[in-house]
Amino acid sequence: MAGKSGEEKMKAMEAEMALFEQEVLGAPVALPPVDPVPLPIPAVPVIRAIIATNTYSQVQQSLEARAAAAASVVGPMIVPPVPFVGPAIPPPRPPVMRPSFIPHALQRPAEPHGAMPRPSFIPHVLQQRAVGPRHPGMPPPQPLMAHHMHGPPPPLMRHIPPPPLGMRAGPPPAPVGPLPPPPRPVVPSAPKMNPTVIQAAPTVYTAPPVRKPEEEIVEPPILPDEKETLSFEEAVIGPSMPEMEPVQPEVVLEPVQEDKKKTKPEKLKRCIRTAAGTSWEDQSLLEWESDDFRIFCGDLGNEVNDDILARAFSRYPSFLRAKVIRDKRTGKTKGYGFVSFKDPNDYVRAMREMNGKYVGSRPIKLRKSQWKDRNMDVVRKKQREKKKLGLR
C-alpha cells in the first residue's frame, strides 16, 4: 500500500508541475484524461504512509531513474546548434506584464472539475527534481491526491521556471539586440616608409668609401718615387753629408764650455777669512752682494733684530739689506750688525745722519765695514802690492 501511494504521489506531482509550466507560458490549461479514481475521504492513513522513513528514499530513487532514462533517450535526439546567420530570428513576443508574485490559487482559471482538489504544499527538492525533460512516450502525470491541511496554503517559493518542452531540444536562442559592427581592417601605412629610409642610408655611406680607396691607391706609388729621388740625390750630393756631421759636435761642445765657465765662478765664491792669525771659510758672506757698500752697526741692544734695524735704514732708496749677528748655539745677539747700500751717496748720508741715533734702547755707533780686509784673497793682493812698492 505504501509503494502504491508513493507512485501516485509522484504522478500527482508531475501533473502539478506540467500545469504550472503551462500557466507560466500563458497557454490554455488542458487537463490530461484521468481515470476516475475513487477518492476516499479519510486520507489519514495515506499521509501516515508518506511520512514513513522509506518513502523519501523510494521517491528519490524513482526520480533519479526517470531522469537517467530521459537523458539517455533524449540525448541523441538533440539537434546540434546552428550558427547564427543573420536576421532570421523571428521578432520576440511582446512581454506580458505580470506581477512579480501571484498566489497559486489566483493564477489558475476556474476549472470545470471543481471537485478535484490540488495539493497545498510541494517540497522545494521535489520541485527541482520533478521538472526535467520528458520523453514523448512517457505517460501523462496523474493529479495529486487531495488531503486537508490546517490553515491557508503558503505561497510558493520563487524560482525561474524551466523553458517549455518544445524549446529544450533546440539550441538556446541568441540574444536579440543590435548587431555589433564588423571589425574594420587595419591598413598598415607607416611601415611602407621605413624601407625607403633604410635604402637611402646605404647610398649616403657607400659614396665616401669609394673615394678613399682611390686616394689610398694613388698615394703608395708616390712614396717609392720619393725614395728613389732621395736615393738619387744622396748619390749625387754624397760629399755634402760629411759637412753636416761636424756641425752637430760643435753645437754640443759649446754648452760644455759654458758649463766650465759657470763652474769657475762658483769656485771663486769661497770666502776664506783671516783674523788673529787663523783662517776659516765664512759662508755668510755669500748672502751679500760683493759690490755693495756696507756699514758696521755696533752697540745694539738685545731687543734689536733684523726687522728693527731694517726699519731704521729703509728710508734710503738704495737700501739693500740689514742683518743682526747672533750666536749659533744660544741665538742671542752679539751686539752688532751690518747694513748695505747700492748707492755710495746713500751710504755717506746714512753714516752722517744715523750715527749716534737711538735704535731700540741704545744709541747706535756706525763705521765703515772692513770685511774685504779680512778676505784672504784681498789680503794677499795687498801684500803683493806692498812688496812691489818695497814698503814691507
From Swiss-Prot:
Q: Cellular component per GO?
A: cytoplasm; nucleus
**Region listing for Disordered, in residue ranges:** 372-392
GO MF, one annotated term:
mRNA binding
Q: Where in the cell is it found?
A: Nucleus; Cytoplasm
Residue ranges constituting the RRM domain according to the UniProt record? 293-371
Compositional bias (Basic residues): 381-392
| KW DNA repair (keyword) present | no
InterPro entries per UniProt: Nucleotide-bd_a/b_plait_sf (IPR012677), RBD_domain_sf (IPR035979), RBM42_RBP45_47-like (IPR050825), RBM42_RRM (IPR034215), RRM_dom (IPR000504)
Domain of life per record? Eukaryota
Q: Is-annotated flag, keyword Cell inner membrane?
A: no
Key words, A-Z: Cytoplasm, Nucleus, RNA-binding
According to its UniProt entry, what is the function of this protein?
Answer: May bind RNA.
Protein family (similarity comment): Belongs to the RRM RBM42 family.
Q: What is this protein called?
A: RNA-binding protein 42
Question: Which species expresses this protein natively?
Answer: Xenopus tropicalis (Western clawed frog)
Identify the gene encoding this protein.
Answer: rbm42
